[in-house]
């Protein structure tokens, strides 16, 4: 039993070690960013200092981009390893299977509605029209009621069309029954 635990811990430990290395790279990235800002904010008095500062900024920027690249590559590798091991147990040497998780879809229409409301509000601010907040709410309620009425009318029309179609089918089947009776 302890051999199985050791093999289980190997795969898990490898993943943890890899994520730790990525975490260290992120810390290094943040350190490089802070040193870049420090170099940028330090005033230089002579032209020699300015060229030195430019060289430092180039080197630090290069370090930042290298760190970002290394972090992105490391995360992609980890995601790939995780994806390969979801739902199967024979993809890694330790026979570990990662169970799939279900991710529920969030309500994305709410964000769109809020965005549209914000855009309307910004348009009123930009155009300089003063509108009362209660007036906007009343207009919004009226628009919502109109949309609801339109939806109800559409559903009523669909119901009527369905009823008509059913009645037509009944009539045609009754006519077929009469024709069958006449033949018999």
Curated annotation (Swiss-Prot):
InterPro entries the UniProt entry points to: Mediator_Med11
Bias (Polar residues) ranges: 142-152
Gene Ontology MF terms: transcription coregulator activity
Location in or out of the cell: Nucleus
Listed Pfam families: Med11
Transcription found in the keyword field: yes
Intrachain S-S bonds: none
Record protein name field: Mediator of RNA polymerase II transcription subunit 11
UniProt gene name: MED11
